[in-house]
Amino acid sequence: MEKYRKTEILQIVEEEGVEFIRLQFTDMFGTLKNVAVPVSCLEKAMDDRSAIDLASLNGFAKEEETELYLKPDFSTFTILPWRPQNGKVARFLCDVCTEDEREYELSPRLILKRALEKAEKQGYTLEVNPECEFFLFHTDDDGMPTTVSHERAGYLDTSPIDLGENTRRDIILTLEEMGYQITSSHHEIAPAQHEIDFAFEDALSTADKVMTFKMAVRTIAKRYGLHATFMPKPRQDVNGSGMHLHMRLLKNGRNVFTGENGELSTDGEAFLAGILGHVVGMTAVFNPLVNSYKRLVPGFEAPSDVTWSRTQRNALLHVRKRRGEGVDLELRSPDCAANPYLLLALCLEAGLDGIRKQQKAPKELTEDIRRLSGEEKKQRKIQSLPDNLGVALDAMGQDLLVREVLGESYVAEYQKMKRREWKNYLEQVTKWELEQYLYLV
């Protein structure tokens, strides 16, 4: 994103007739929050003097630190294109700070910045290209979201079959107006499912843009009378929505993952091995919802086992060669419910842990894993991903690297809140149970 000085922002605000400023930040679970201030308070806000009471925000603030401060990142300043042209609205993404101007330890953005600074000291820069999938559903007569769509389009279909094409195009034009580089978009496999892909960018900018992207997509969809959802598996009978991450690691401007003859390098293999070694413990962050695990099942093009491959695109980690760009690693398990700051921090730290230890990757998957029986997987020592949120939370607490990267306080609070969510789910009496047992028992 373009870097702005304070004086430049004040000038733009005056020239563009901006009247409101949104001070946005991300909570520990990846939800975008904001405080709106009138333009008369802009200078005060830019001097980090916007206090927020976080006592009612689950898990974010400790009892002794319920009042914190928002520190705008000037590089994230943008005017929101979908707001009225009279009385425009702009926004900053903010870091959360304590009264003594320290960045707050439970701030997800701080956790990623800390990981990036650590990598930078070793000469590394992480670049990421996310592929974000979502559904566009109809709303009911009261404007509430449904899982209904009259569309029957499939992979790469176009209009008039793809009924969401105009919405998707408007989303992209809006994002480009906000400084995004969009490399492609298309209809996905399931009816009413869409994908928009970003260009490679540094990890912090990517995480910031993912947060803004979700807000923009939902806002533009609403203009068309549609509800955009990033829920991983809103319908049982079709593919779910993920957020595949393409990653490359640079050192002195060179792609570390690309070795001789354009193949995966030794350090690239070690980075890959580091992620595979910790992915079970990181899954509660990559896939943070009860619903996330209904996507990670065989038969719907989502990974359910800890595998890597150059040729099998259903593997958890796919090694991809791009013409003229070298090798990148595609991680296929995360979904858009994940907090992108935590997601990228964990990927980077786990990968660098692999490089530091010069780890070797497990045996490469060279055939379709769907053809392997459970016994064959066991013989090949292929580990499964957690199959529910409860198992994932247990694994999270047992992974020392996850606890080190996120911090013990963060992990404890995250587990507490998510276990409450998991327990609440387990206590529900579902429609399936009633259909199966009410008549028979």
Label the model's feature ranges.
Residues 1-441:
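Glycine-rich, acidic/polar active-site loops that bind/position phosphate-bearing ligands
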